[in-house]
A protein has these predicted regions:
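Serine/proline-rich low-complexity intrinsically disordered segments, especially terminal tails, linkers
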Residues: 8, 18-19, 37
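Residues at the start of alpha-helices and the adjacent loop-to-helix junctions
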Residues: 13, 19-20, 138
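Targeting-peptide/extracellular-domain and disordered-appendage signature
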Residues: 5, 34-173
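N-terminal secretory signal peptides that target proteins for export/translocation
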Residues: 1-15
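Bacterial N-terminal signal peptides
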Residues: 18-32
Length: 173
């Protein structure tokens, strides 16, 4: 009878051993797939921007004020494109001189086939149409098309001292 138990244990070990090996292989593949790689960094620049403000009777310092921006842009690979943005004021703190604004920015290249989009809210000085120079805002990347289809990650938008802008995208692999 002891011999039969021993064979049963060996049989059980033979069944679990391939199963265990298969689980190890699947686990290794899963870990490799999830480990990803290094984030891809893409940088766009453009000159100073002047908004078109849409709120009758104000300079834009009101909830619901809409500012639109357009500028020629350049990618770090030398390609030329455009920068388009819409900014909506969603809250005003008059005592602090600050506004919360929701912004969507689209960088478009290759006649619009390649677009990278970021969107998010930030606090701005009420007196200006943009963040102060030498300041940076971080926003999520919400998508893209063409070359950047399925893009996700985050972007830093920096208002440079000379009035120009640098937008650094950190795209997940």
């Amino acid at each position: 009878m002891a011999l039969k138990q021993s064979n049963a244990r060996r049989g059980h070990a033979a069944i679990t051993s391939p199963l265990f090996a298969a689980l190890l292989v699947v686990g290794a593949i899963f870990m490799a797939a999830c480990s990803g790689g290094a984030a891809k960094v893409v940088t766009f620049t453009h000159g100073a921007v002047t908004p078109t403000t849409i709120v009758l009777g104000t300079d834009g310092g009101a909830i619901g004020a809409v500012r639109t921006f357009h500028a020629d842009a350049k990618a770090d690979d030398g390609k030329s494109g455009t920068f388009d943005a819409t900014m909506v004021t969603t809250a005003v703190d008059a005592a602090a001189g600050l506004e919360t604004r929701l912004t969507t920015i689209v960088f478009s290249f290759s006649d619009g086939a390649d677009q990278l989009i970021l969107s998010g809210s930030a606090v701005y000085p009420a007196a200006g149409s943009t963040i102060k120079t030498a300041a940076t805002v971080v926003r999520p990347v919400i998508g893209g098309s063409g070359r950047w289809a399925g893009a996700r990650g985050w972007a830093e938008s920096t208002h440079e001292a000379d009035g120009s802008w640098t937008h650094t995208f950190h795209l997940e692999p």
